């Protein structure tokens, strides 16, 4: 229906840059929604699981643009340089033996404030919950359908929040298209 059409601002040359326009409508608008939904602030330390994928890289860039400290968590070692050059303060592979120690060292034993899990498998969701500090927020965007276990006393004592997020709203796409500063986020 016509109500689903979104006006593209004149400042965006969608005829000559159709790929960039499409990226703004997904890989920029989705991280914008995540920032709002997870209530991410400048003081937060944020882990991004699946940081080397399209949404993950743009999430790192969005966090960096907003002066938020991020930890790129990725199993593919060939993504390390991209994650770091796009603004991640630290790059870690969850397959390393000292992974949990590295998170605790980086956060001075407080744990992460937010973990954004673009993979959302049983393994990554359980890992996410264990990385969070007091008042931590876990936001999952993957749709694996896997069940995962978290110690309920950990949720209680740390006052953790677990939330899901799917694709952004029409308004968030409009917001992304209308903010010229997001053009800087496009991965070259």
Specify the residue positions occupied by each region the protein language model found.
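Rossmann-fold NAD(P)-dependent oxidoreductase module
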Residues: 58-62
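NAD(P)H dinucleotide-binding glycine-rich loop of Rossmann-like/cofactor-binding domains
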Residues: 1-50
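Hydrophobic/small residue at the entry helix of a nucleotide-binding pocket
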Residues: 30, 54-55, 123
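Adenosine-nucleotide cofactor-binding segment
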Residues: 14, 45-51, 64-127
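A generic alpha-to-beta junction signature in SAM-dependent methyltransferases
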Residues: 39-40, 107, 119, 131-133
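Glycine-rich phosphate-binding loop and adjacent beta-alpha segment
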Residues: 66-68, 122-186
């Amino acid at each position: 229906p016509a109500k689903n059409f979104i006006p593209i601002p004149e400042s965006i040359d969608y005829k000559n840059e159709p790929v960039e326009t499409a990226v703004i409508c997904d890989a920029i608008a989705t991280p914008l929604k995540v920032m709002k939904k997870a209530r991410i602030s400048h003081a937060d330390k944020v882990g991004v699981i699946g940081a080397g994928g399209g949404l993950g890289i743009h999430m790192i860039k969005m966090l960096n643009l907003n002066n938020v400290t991020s930890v790129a968590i990725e199993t593919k070692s060939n993504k390390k340089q991209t994650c770091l050059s796009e603004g991640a303060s630290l790059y870690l592979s969850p397959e390393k033996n000292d992974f949990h120690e590295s998170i605790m060292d980086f956060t001075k034993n407080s744990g992460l404030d937010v973990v954004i899990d673009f993979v959302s498998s049983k393994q990554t969701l359980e890992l996410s919950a264990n990385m969070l500090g007091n008042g931590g927020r876990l936001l999952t965007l993957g749709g694996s359908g896997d069940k995962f276990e978290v110690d309920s006393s950990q949720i209680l004592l740390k006052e953790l929040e677990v939330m899901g997020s799917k694709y952004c709203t029409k308004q968030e796409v409009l917001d992304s298209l209308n903010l010229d500063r997001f053009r800087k986020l496009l991965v070259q």
